[in-house]
């Protein structure tokens, strides 16, 4: 055999090896990381995920510690007799059964269509091509993670830390949370990956090769083991982790930053504040009571509530042609420039009202609401310019307030990983005009408009890290 033929044969064998590495049945893969692998190094109790038994009870148990609410199923307070409790349970039983049946049939297919086996089979060639591209072009490393509920999570890691010219973005890891019909093989990770960041993609339980059924509690368990894998096996410091959630992925993204507040940043793309308004939009009006109950008990994607629990930098990407997360109209095409019904608007208002309640009182909320109605980048810029916002003055005011808080809280735990804890009472004593200008400044720093539809791939230059004061 000549030298050239030998080289060709060697290249062919190498390609066969690479192909086998990602087409080999996932169930036969060795486990790379388990949720309890970090117990030996003293895992913090505040990062407790759901146990297998607790997973069946829902994500509420997990939210109880962080949000400070009452856990679902906690015995009612007061002196109610056992007979009254039993009677109440019997009255609610038909509704609970109907809600359970809807959630485990049509509901799950509507909320997580990517888990339908027929869709997975139809997309299998594209998924294999996507894996091939990530492995061969970006040297992706596939790994199997096991969550606390026993689900096996399929992940792909692209390490850009040693990539030439990646000294700016490469040291940061972007954990990508896909939508309800997204897979890491062909999902939202392409934008941060092409922008030069290290990227960790994963599939929801029941999506692709990941096992299990996609319910919020199982999604939270999967996200928990993914974050632990990034911290303890891939060895990225918490401050270098950026969580990026697209669409329904905003739930797991906000859950991660709520549970791990020391993570570096959060980017939410084309997501919403709450699932109930969107569910009511597509379901019959006569089903309203059943739909609300089903969502609250089985698909409580409370993105806004979880978002307000994260103290770090946040950027919201609102797509101006997005008809999926919009409640404008009912099952009709979205008219150009109609962004008033986009649920990302409520997400921004909830965030700003939590962080800056004085600024967002009355005049502040009103002016931000009008600014959010701008249907194009030109209209947005014109509205902003009309109020003559002095950005230097806004920055100086915010930095001065933060410095005073840091002096008062020096050495105390209240300072937190991102500085003084929210809410900030900055803006007291300001005139109405100045509060409006400060509110507009903060809104523009936390939300960026992208002229695209819900399913359009995000351009690499559109993916940016959030603003830091």
Curated annotation (Swiss-Prot):
Protein EC: 3.1.1.111
Domain AB hydrolase-1, residue spans: 174-298
SUPFAM superfamilies per record: alpha/beta-Hydrolases
GO BP terms, alphabetized: monoacylglycerol catabolic process; phosphatidylserine catabolic process
Reactions mediated catalytically: a 1,2-diacyl-sn-glycero-3-phospho-L-serine + H2O = a 2-acyl-sn-glycero-3-phospho-L-serine + a fatty acid + H(+); a 1-acylglycerol + H2O = glycerol + a fatty acid + H(+); 1-(9Z-octadecenoyl)-glycerol + H2O = glycerol + (9Z)-octadecenoate + H(+)
GO MF term (any one): monoacylglycerol lipase activity
A GO term from the CC aspect: nucleoplasm
Superkingdom to which the source organism belongs: Eukaryota
A Pfam family of this chain: Abhydrolase_1
TM regions (residue ranges): none
Keywords: Hydrolase, Lipid metabolism, Phospholipid metabolism
Catalytic residues (UniProt): 247, 322, 418
Protein family: Belongs to the AB hydrolase superfamily. ABHD16 family.
Stated role: Hydrolyzes the sn-1 position of glycerophospholipids with high specificity towards phosphatidylserine (PS), PS-PLA1 enzyme. Also hydrolyzes the acyl chain of glycerolipids with a preference for the monoacylglycerol (MAG) 1-acylglycerol, MAG lipase. Plays a regulatory role in cellular lipid homeostasis by modulating genes involved in neutral lipid degradation and in phospholipid synthesis and composition.
Protein name: ABHD16B
Lineage: Eukaryota, Metazoa, Chordata, Craniata, Vertebrata
